[in-house]
Amino acid sequence: MNNILKNDWNNYIGNEFEKDYYLKLRKNLAQEYKTKTIYPDMYNIFNALHYTAFDDVKVVILGQDPYHGPNQAHGLSFSVNPGVRTPPSLLNIYKELKDDIGCYIPNNGYLKKWADQGVLLLNTVLTVRAGEANSHKNIGWQIFTDNIIKVLNTREKPIVFILWGNNAIRKEELITNPKHHIIKSVHPSPLSASRGFFGSKPFSKTNEFLKNDNEIPIDWQIENL
């Protein structure tokens, strides 16, 4: 069980996989994957952790749960697989990115470039039933992802936490280390973006924090594929 995570995350949260809540979650998930269509593919569930090692995390962008349409989710919050239409929330993120720091709006929603630079794209719930948003919110994932946030909170090297929407902002209480930075606003969803997401400048603010902490800023431009 302890070999699920292949990088340094294993040292920090590897023991979660042995805990009762996780064993119950795993059993539940095995049944769900067997009998229903679940996203993402089971081999992609932990991609956020695989792509961004614990020691490499500079920024955390918290999402809610995976996209629930075909071929969209691949384990990174807000990101979709190449070749899939950019979802509305991500399109709004791109619009803010353009207004904030001048990035052009790309023809895809594949955010692995961010993950490779130290942006942990973490959903608070890591799986979902096809077509049923939030269908896995009560099966134990929140315990697991809360513990990820708690262990990041203990880190000496500062992290920028980007919290969009009430679901993410509720996690602010887990971030108690004064070394870290918190940027928060309403969610980029079309339902709320015009009430304070547009114009919030999270990307330039993040890079300002990173520069002040002597870290290399993030190159936020996602290129056309």
Swiss-Prot record:
It comes from Clostridium botulinum (strain Eklund 17B / Type B). One of its GO terms (biological process) is base-excision repair, AP site formation via deaminated base removal. Signal peptide: none annotated. This is Uracil-DNA glycosylase. The gene is ung. GO terms for molecular function: uracil DNA N-glycosylase activity. It is an enzyme of class 3 (hydrolase). Belongs to the uracil-DNA glycosylase (UDG) superfamily. UNG family. The active site is at D65 (proton acceptor).
